[in-house]
Amino acid sequence: MEEILIWIKKLEKYLYALNAKVAGIPLYKIIIASAIMLFTLILRRLIAFLIVKILTKLTIRTKTDVDELIVKAFVKPFSYFIVVFGFYLSLLVLEVPKVYADKFLKTFSLLILGWAIIRFLNLFHNKIVEFFVKVGGKDFAEEVGDFILKILKAFVVVIVGASLLQEWGVNIGAILASVGLLGLAVSLAAKDTFENILSGLIILLDKPVKVGETVKVKDFMGSVEDIGLRSTKIRTFDKSLVTIPNRDIVNNHVENFTRRNKRRVRFYIGVVYSTKREQLENILKEIRELLKEHPGVAKDEKFYVYFENYGDSSLNILIQYYANTNDYEEYLKIIEDINLKIMEIVEKNGSSFAFPSRSVYIEKMPKS
């Protein structure tokens, strides 16, 4: 009995102690608030895990994996939100004015939301790169992906920052006006950069050139080595690397040799003036037959073989046809084979190629 009385007296002392106040706050409220904080700190990961498990089961049923990225991006921020919410409840228990507790909750909720969105953008970056790899190559895709990621992140930071300022009663109208003027100044200073970036995106979508193609832009001709966000690199035939701003490619005529399905060949041959009419007619006829039968000559294009004019030292024959290839080496092989056969035709018909010559006639020999 005495032991029970002793325990009751201890309990009375304990209950009396709970009525005590610390900084004007009842001790029992401090204990409850501390318990809430401890509970959320211990169970935040468990709660987040259970919610993520439920959401994951739902996302598996969908065809896209974007929702899986969203869950993956938001799981860690959500666990921190649980702690913030527990702290918010603790503030209410401690009788902190609700207006300040609400501001605390909204402030950290915005920060956590912004963090979660940026985490999602980092994960989604690979998707952006994969999309642009299909149309512009790996290097270009990574550059475009990084650029888009930075723009989106900056947008998120601006929106979250503006929302926080507005939540704390800061007039963002004046700030936006100042930012607008600053943005105008920056945009004017970076006009060329933005123009090149926009042109890079146009090149990506319109595809006037691709890596590996042989092109001519302005006075530069060569193979495209790289298409960047701001410039395109062309390796000329003398192995010089030329960097051309993307806006110059968009604003100028681009001749793409790789996309030609055939190449035109046009030249003149000159035979000597001693060539008889019958010989010349036979030469023209046999060259036409050669071009008609040659496998390297495009059959869907007209060819021309005509005695066109009288030169200073030769009878000039125009020869024009289309080589049925866009490969440069194959193109040269076709030209070489046809040229050798033309040489045989001229020699077979008893004529020869003329070369510039001048005859000097002396009417009277000078007296010695």
Swiss-Prot record:
Q: What is an example of a Pfam family matching this protein?
A: MS_channel_1st
Q: What is this protein called?
A: Uncharacterized MscS family protein aq_812
Q: What keywords is this UniProt entry annotated with?
A: Cell membrane, Membrane, Transmembrane, Transmembrane helix
Membrane topology according to the record = Multi-pass membrane protein
Give the matching Gene3D superfamilies.
Answer: 1.10.287.1260, 2.30.30.60, 3.30.70.100
The organism is Aquifex aeolicus (strain VF5)
One Gene Ontology cellular component: plasma membrane
Transmembrane region positions? 22-42, 74-94, 104-124, 144-164, 168-188
Q: Which PROSITE patterns match?
A: UPF0003
- Presence of the UniProt keyword Cell membrane in the record: yes
Instruction: Tell me the GO BP annotations in alphabetical order.
Output: transmembrane transport
Annotated disulfide bonds:
none
Q: Does the keyword Cytoplasm apply?
A: no
UniProt similarity note: Belongs to the MscS (TC 1.A.23) family.
Q: What is its main location?
A: membrane
Localization recorded for this chain is:
Cell membrane
**Superkingdom of this protein's organism:** Bacteria
